[in-house]
């Protein structure tokens, strides 16, 4: 028999989501570094090859020039930001589901799950944008040959000194454009696959680890299929010199399409997709493990 439905606890989602986010960063950061460097590399001069010819070339050159630490450059910022960010993300999803339920027995439709996921994207933008801004600046400085920042705190301090609090929130609109629809797709896909993988008469809470990993991994792939174009624009905008794009993302979009074509909106696609499966598989597995632990120690929380 299937278990009785449990009331949704946004607070448990908050705690378990933070742990899931930490798992995601440790697994996925090296390829995130590759992704950002591919997205922000300047156009190659006539007759000269680009700095990186692709995902594997960027990975190899980073490893050769900077060692394994180069692949984890800038990780402190997402670790500091990602725990509360994923906590808030899963909290927003849990709250979005709870607001649409009249009782714990109500099964939400997939459009309702998509809506709950979009709410989580709105919730996370305030935390996500500063961390992404610092992370991107640190990730590209080594490949550009400029060492303006010695680390996460130094980057944060200099950003504040130069631009004030607004310096941390450069790219907020693009972060919203990326995360709101992508988060809806993320959670809807995960819930759909969990239901698909659950044998008849069983509970989704009894899913095996391999099935959770597959559901989480494909949720990450579907998420990034939606998110890549605005993510490319965001990375380019957040790492640009002050004043380069006075009209915001519209200027970035026009420049990219004019100089590099529509395919430039999918720069870093291979790195993103290679990273998306293992990183998000780790995230959802971490979330489910933490949730089981919380349900065990505090069933009525």
Swiss-Prot record:
Solcar repeats lie at residues 8-99, 108-196, 207-293. The lineage of its organism: Eukaryota, Metazoa, Chordata, Craniata, Vertebrata. The keyword Transmembrane applies. Widely expressed, with highest levels in the liver, intermediate levels in heart, testis and kidney and low levels in brain, including cortex, cerebellum, hippocampus and hypothalamus. The gene is Slc25a20. GO terms for biological process: carnitine shuttle; carnitine transmembrane transport; in utero embryonic development. Keywords: Acetylation, Lipid transport, Membrane, Mitochondrion, Mitochondrion inner membrane, Repeat, Transmembrane, Transmembrane helix, Transport. The modification N6-succinyllysine is found at residue 170. Belongs to the mitochondrial carrier (TC 2.A.29) family. It holds the Pfam family Mito_carr. This is Mitochondrial carnitine/acylcarnitine carrier protein. The modification N6-acetyllysine is found at residues 148, 157, 170. It catalyses: O-acetyl-(R)-carnitine(in) + (R)-carnitine(out) = O-acetyl-(R)-carnitine(out) + (R)-carnitine(in); an O-acyl-(R)-carnitine(in) + (R)-carnitine(out) = an O-acyl-(R)-carnitine(out) + (R)-carnitine(in); O-propanoyl-(R)-carnitine(in) + (R)-carnitine(out) = O-propanoyl-(R)-carnitine(out) + (R)-carnitine(in); O-hexadecanoyl-(R)-carnitine(in) + (R)-carnitine(out) = O-hexadecanoyl-(R)-carnitine(out) + (R)-carnitine(in). Residues 32-73, 132-170, 231-267 are mitochondrial matrix. It is found in: Mitochondrion inner membrane. It is a multi-pass membrane protein. GO terms for molecular function: carnitine transmembrane transporter activity; O-acyl-L-carnitine transmembrane transporter activity. Mediates the electroneutral exchange of acylcarnitines (O-acyl-(R)-carnitine or L-acylcarnitine) of different acyl chain lengths (ranging from O-acetyl-(R)-carnitine to long-chain O-acyl-(R)-carnitines) with free carnitine ((R)-carnitine or L-carnitine) across the mitochondrial inner membrane, via a ping-pong mechanism. Key player in the mitochondrial oxidation pathway, it translocates the fatty acids in the form of acylcarnitines into the mitochondrial matrix, where the carnitine palmitoyltransferase 2 (CPT-2) activates them to undergo fatty acid beta-oxidation. It comes from the Eukaryota. The chain crosses the membrane at residues 13-31, 74-93, 113-131, 171-190, 212-230, 268-287. It comes from Mus musculus (Mouse). Its main location: mitochondrion. GO terms for cellular component: cytosol; mitochondrial inner membrane; mitochondrion. Residues 2-12, 94-112, 191-211, 288-301 are cytoplasmic. The modification N-acetylalanine is found at residue 2. The keyword Transmembrane applies.
